């Protein structure tokens, strides 16, 4: 997932909730991403109100896509270093993932995903199927991720891929058979949740045909 631009924090007010009142938000850290603390009163099952606090990490919103070559039954992955994974039990931090990225301010998810696909895996994809927009870690992160699928072939190849040089991205593009990718999930070689989710969607779609 490209981290090319600092995303705009989510400053808009939260929607109404009859079980939450006096919601106040303070910024704890405003660096590349934004860390905030929300304090609020939360209605308890007995009708009483309890003051609570939660911290939320704001990194903008993102998009991810699975590109499938239906003729050869292959998909495109990228391998990149993920420091947080390396700090939490992953042996070397080098994760295999589907191409993904953050949305620029005011940018729609489809436009962002097309850009990321060309930068990361080197394919210009005009037609993407939008599946869902999901919160991946709603207990601590504000980000939601929009999921896409599409097809690729030799005709869609437009450049080398591997990430944007001016953003110091260093990605290895990896093409694998769908069956092998699923075996890699079972062996613990693919441990990225968004990648597993879209692989499952592809496999289920093939079963239904």
Where is each model-derived feature located?
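Acidic, metal-coordinating catalytic segment for phosphate/diphosphate chemistry
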Residues: 28-72, 86
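Nudix hydrolase/Nudix homology domain
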Residues: 2-24, 79, 91-94, 105, ...
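Unchanged
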Residues: 52, 61-64, 99-191
């Amino acid at each position: 997932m490209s981290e090319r631009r600092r995303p705009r924090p989510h400053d808009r007010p939260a929607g109404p909730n009859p079980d939450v009142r006096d919601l106040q938000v303070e910024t704890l850290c405003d660096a590349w991403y934004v860390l905030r603390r929300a304090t609020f009163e939360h209605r308890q099952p007995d009708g009483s109100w309890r003051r609570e606090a939660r911290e939320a990490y704001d990194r903008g919103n993102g998009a991810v896509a699975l590109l499938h070559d239906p003729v050869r039954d292959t998909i495109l992955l990228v391998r990149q270093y993920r420091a947080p994974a390396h700090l939490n039990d992953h042996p070397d931090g080098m994760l295999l993932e589907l191409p993904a990225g953050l949305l620029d301010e005011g940018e729609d998810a489809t436009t962002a995903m097309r850009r990321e696909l060309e930068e990361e895996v080197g394919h210009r994809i005009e037609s993407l199927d939008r599946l869902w927009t999901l919160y991946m870690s709603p207990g601590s992160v504000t980000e939601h991720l929009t999921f896409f699928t599409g097809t690729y072939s030799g005709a869609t190849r437009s450049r080398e891929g591997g990430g944007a040089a001016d953003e110091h991205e260093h990605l290895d593009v990896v093409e694998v058979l769908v069956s092998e990718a699923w075996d890699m999930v079972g062996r613990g070689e693919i441990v990225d949740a968004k990648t597993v989710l879209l692989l499952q969607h592809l496999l289920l779609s093939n079963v239904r045909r």
